[in-house]
């Protein structure tokens, strides 16, 4: 079975995914591989799957509460949106039975993980996959360590290459992930360039699994911005934004050029907390200036 071994969290609920779980699958069920890929994986495990798909957030909250969902599968950004919708519905997070979230389909930072775990009171695990290979399940974090994604090496051979030269890089060096399928009968791929940036970690994991791990995806090689000679990944900016109270993880980066200089403009989505925080800070600053 492809699942994370159970551990415990502070409320004494198990984490991971087992046959006894009720899995709320909020990945899209259209042409996107996430929905059906996760669906059939949960069925193979023997757990109960709720094929909710994306959208209809109020309905999702109702189903999650009515069916007693224990595991949430979605994009990390949608998990945060769900957390707000749960509160808007007048429900207490503690009354839900969720204990684990399995999130993928988009890059996300450790700051975002901390926010999800805090708002939903779950353990948030990262899962990796891509349509060309097999969808979700190429690699997943264990609930014991949450420190890198274990690659299913009986099915996939992974390498790291220099994205510019294509030369292989040793373990520990960051670069582009290349995947060779070992068990696919339909459309096998040899040294497929994913454009995903990560590194291989060969240090034994404390969970005891011997499969090598890849670090959290840092971004795509074609997402990397070079601003005045400095390599910048959107996830680095996201980490800074999420440290500011009142700023949501929804943002837009606009790169332009003035003369010979690159200009990066960051547009963010904010809520009322930001204005109240900034307002109090400005009020204190103005008060000090008046007294002086």
Q: What does each model-found stretch correspond to?
A:
Residues 3-10, 287-290:
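Short, small-residue-biased leader/transition segments that mark boundaries at the very start
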